[in-house]
Amino acid sequence: MYNTDYKKYNVDIFHPAHFEDIQEESADCGPNVQEVRQFLESNRLEYALQSVLLNPPFGHSEQELKNRAVLLVAEVIHAFRQTDIEESVHKLSNENGDILMKYIYKAMQLCSDSATCLSLLLWHSQLVSKFGQGSIVRVLSNRQRL
C-alpha cells in the first residue's frame, strides 16, 4: 500500500504570513541612549548619528523600545543644521542610509511636530539624492520593521 502520512500535515501553518521567527531578545537591543545624549550635549552630531545607527532594534517584539529608538533618531537628526545635512549624508554607507531611511519613515508616522517633520523631509530628500529611489524600494520591501 501507499504511505499517506504526508496528508496529516496542515500546510496552512507553514504560510510565510503566519511564520514567526524566534528572535533573541537582548538588553542591548537599540541604540545606547547615554552615549548618544553625551554626543548631543558635546555637539558632536556626526558621532551621535553613527552611534544611533549602530544597533537598530529590528526583530525586537517590544514596540515601545522601537518607538523610543525612533524618537531618539529624530532628535539627533533634528539637531543638525540644514547646511550640514548633505555632508553628513555623503559620509553614510549604503547600509546606514537604508537604516536611517527606515527610521525617517517611522518617525514621520510618530512625530507630529512640524519642525521635526521638516527636518525629516530634508534628510529624506538628501538620502534620495545620494542613494536614489532604490533606497525607498529597499525600505518598503524589507521585512525587518521598526
UniProtKB/Swiss-Prot annotation:
The keyword Methyltransferase does not apply. Keywords: Actin-binding, Cytoplasm, Cytoskeleton. It is found in: Cytoplasm, Cytoskeleton. GO terms for cellular component: Arp2/3 protein complex; cytoplasm. SUPFAM superfamilies: Arp2/3 complex 16 kDa subunit ARPC5. One of its GO terms (molecular function) is actin filament binding. GO terms for biological process: Arp2/3 complex-mediated actin nucleation; cell migration; regulation of actin filament polymerization. Component of the Arp2/3 complex composed of ARP2, ARP3, ARPC1B/p41-ARC, ARPC2/p34-ARC, ARPC3/p21-ARC, ARPC4/p20-ARC and ARPC5/p16-ARC. Functions as a component of the Arp2/3 complex which is involved in regulation of actin polymerization and together with an activating nucleation-promoting factor (NPF) mediates the formation of branched actin networks. Belongs to the ARPC5 family. This is Probable actin-related protein 2/3 complex subunit 5. It comes from Caenorhabditis elegans.
